[in-house]
C-alpha cells in the first residue's frame, strides 16, 4: 500500500481528502496533520515511510510552503502534491521549484484528484522499473505522451468509439439526470470498471461535471451530469 499523509488545518477538508484517498485502490491515509510541526513529527518519526504528502498552503498562522525546503534539505524521499486555493504565480513557482509533483487548485473535481494520485504512482513505478532510458521512454515519463503531440480528446487505449457512442447516447437522452457510475453501467450493460474509465475521460474533456455525495454509510458516491456549455461536443460522440 502507498502511505499518504494529509496536511490541512481544516478538519472537514482533511476528512474529505481522506475519503478520496480511500476510494483509490492501493492508497491509504496513514495520518493527518493540522500543523507543520505535527507533520514533521509524522514524516520523520513514522514507523512506515510516508510515500506521498498532500499539502495545503494557507494554514492559519503557517504557510505550507515552509515545509518544502525542510523536506528538501533533509533529502526526504516523500513526494508532495499541493492542494490549495492559492493560485498566484509566485506560490505556484515556489512549489514547482521545490519539486512538487502536482498542484491542485481548490475547489477541484474528484476525477482530477484521482488523476493526480494515479499519475504520480505510474511515474514512480516507471522510475523504479528502469536503470537507463532512451529519449522516447523519457518523453513518456516526463510528458505522459510521445514526443509527437496527441489530440487530447483522442480515446485512450482500451476505450472504443462504439461503447463511447452508446454511453453518450444514453447521457444525451437523460440530459437533466445526475447519474452514478453504477447506474450508467447497468443501463448500458457494461462493467463498472469500464464505465468509470469512459466517465473519467468525459470529465477530462469537460463534457461531464462530477460531484460527490455521501450515502447513509458515509461512503462517497460520484455523480455526473452534462456541462451545458459543452453539450454540442457530447452530440458529436453520439453519431
Swiss-Prot record:
Keywords: Activator, Cytoplasm, DNA-binding, Phosphoprotein, Transcription, Transcription regulation, Two-component regulatory system. GO terms for molecular function: DNA binding; DNA-binding transcription factor activity; phosphorelay response regulator activity. The modification 4-aspartylphosphate is found at residue 56. The keyword Cytoplasm applies. One of its GO terms (cellular component) is cytoplasm. Member of the two-component regulatory system DcuR/DcuS. Involved in the C4-dicarboxylate-stimulated regulation of the genes encoding the anaerobic fumarate respiratory system (frdABCD; nuoAN; dcuB; dcuC; sdhCDAB; etc.). Weakly regulates the aerobic C4-dicarboxylate transporter dctA. It comes from Shigella flexneri. It comes from the Bacteria. Its main location: cytoplasm. It holds the Pfam family Response_reg. Residues 181-200 bind DNA. Residues 3-121 form the Response regulatory domain. It is found in: Cytoplasm. Phosphorylated and activated by DcuS. This is Transcriptional regulatory protein DcuR. The keyword Repressor does not apply. SUPFAM superfamilies: CheY-like. SMART domains: REC.
